[in-house]
Amino acid sequence: MSLWFCPLTSTLNRQQPIHFIGVGGIGMSALALILVNRGHIVSGSDSRENTAVEQLRAQGVRVFRDQSAANIDAICSNVDLLPLVVISTAIPKSNPELKAAKLSQLKILHRSDLLAALIQAQPSIAVAGSHGKTTTSTLLTTLLATTDQDPTAVIGGVVPYYDSNGHVGKGRLLVAEADESDGSLVKFQATLGVITNLELDHTDHYANLDELINTMKRFGQGCRRLLANFDCPILKEHFDATAWWSVKTSAGVDFAALPICLNGDQTIADIYEQGKRMGQITLPMPGLHNLSNAMAAIAACRLEGLSFEDVQQGLADLQPPGRRFDFRGTWEGRQIVDDYAHHPSEVSATLTMARLIVTSGRSQLPNPPKRILAVFQPHRYSRTNKFLYDFARALGEADAVLLAPVYSAGENPIQGATSESLAKAIRIQHPNLPVAVAENFNQLTLLVQKHSLKGDLVLAMGAGNINNLWRQLTHLDNAKRCPPSLAA
């Protein structure tokens, strides 16, 4: 059952409790934070303990440590209005708490409907795309914050400026990350939509690229204005945008960032608007993909009326979100970095950036690394099956590769979609590249100890629980100084 309502304040009574099943999820926790900070009575449940849950409890949110029918009985007792229950696509119909909510005839709302209401209730910017949407929405939120716009933000990652994925601002704008994985972003009707790029992913939901294109078109058509990436061939061919940006050309686009210098610690570029040079920027982040993400954020700010000078000054405070080339600490001379890359294009972009850090000898890491040990955890059998050889090609950019078992994300195994199959594909494409496969997480830690060298960059990539690898290295030199990710 799904309920469409808008605006939020005209439908939700602050005296009506709102309960999130799976509140520790990165998208759910952001919404819960927004609502509790707007005076709503919020509760939730999650079988995982993470930083998101800790933050919610600190805000006074009651979070149950399991998901059971008893939780529904508890939240329905001694209330004047029956609770509204919020779920995400990750919650199966067999969930005992969801089944109890249905038996109690509670209204059940998908998180996308709640986010859609927030987006439509005020001027908003919704950032979508196959890759870079979390980084772009984080950079945009930070630029708006540092230029005294104080936006409300609902992001799928930790925004370092707020140390949170959700923030209630006093400014007029809301920034939201629009996730395409289940198609629910078609409900969002933003003042400005942003699409970073587009290519096939989430093959558990989309049978082919055309289905994904049609979904993203519906998202774009629902926005009052659309800002899109001119460098993406699919967007360029299939979409009619209000404005375009590029990091390759200033001709025929509204905004461009043309790189002058790409180093391992920063990027210097000239900014153009309508073909006119506006000035030079220094982005404190490496990688051409990050320059594109930053250009999208800059363009969105300019479309919302901010001066170029203000935006230019705000760039100095930019940081990527958590789990995006996230330095976690050191272990016996090895530097451990965690990254969310889980699609071949993301793996390639992350390794290209890592290689730039190695070759340039310049880095924001404590020490410039000498070699790249990629530790990759495939995410979902469906994605591994579809992109097996693309993953093999992308991982070839490392100096050595360790593979964790596939993180199922609730999917059933698919024959041939295994880490062993991926290792075989890597050996075929890159015969001289050292590759090893771990049978479990404990063995993965042993393989890191065995195959890594002093001076290595140990780059853990994946969207599952690979971000726990640094914890497994029990002798991490500065573990106490590196807090766990909110998405952990």
From Swiss-Prot:
* Pathways per UniProt: Cell wall biogenesis; peptidoglycan biosynthesis
Question: Which EC class does it fall in?
Answer: ligase
Family matches, as Pfam families: Mur_ligase, Mur_ligase_C, Mur_ligase_M
The record lists the organism as: Prochlorococcus marinus (strain MIT 9313)
* Catalytic reaction list: UDP-N-acetyl-alpha-D-muramate + L-alanine + ATP = UDP-N-acetyl-alpha-D-muramoyl-L-alanine + ADP + phosphate + H(+)
The record's listing under HAMAP family reads: MurC
Please state the protein's primary subcellular location.
cytoplasm
Protein name as it appears in the record: UDP-N-acetylmuramate--L-alanine ligase
Report the InterPro entries cross-referenced here: Mur-like_cat_sf, Mur_ligase_C, Mur_ligase_C_dom_sf, Mur_ligase_cen, Mur_ligase_N, MurCDEF_pg_biosynth, UDP-N-AcMur_Ala_ligase_MurC
Where, by residue number, does ATP bind? G129, S130, H131, G132, K133, T134, T135
Q: What does this protein do?
A: Cell wall formation.
| This enzyme's EC code(s) | 6.3.2.8
Q: Give an example GO molecular function.
A: ATP binding
Entry keywords, A to Z: ATP-binding, Cell cycle, Cell division, Cell shape, Cell wall biogenesis/degradation, Cytoplasm, Ligase, Nucleotide-binding, Peptidoglycan synthesis
Family from the record: Belongs to the MurCDEF family.
Q: Which domain of life is it from?
A: Bacteria
One record GO biological process: cell division
- A single GO cellular-component term on record: cytoplasm
Q: Where in the cell is it found?
A: Cytoplasm
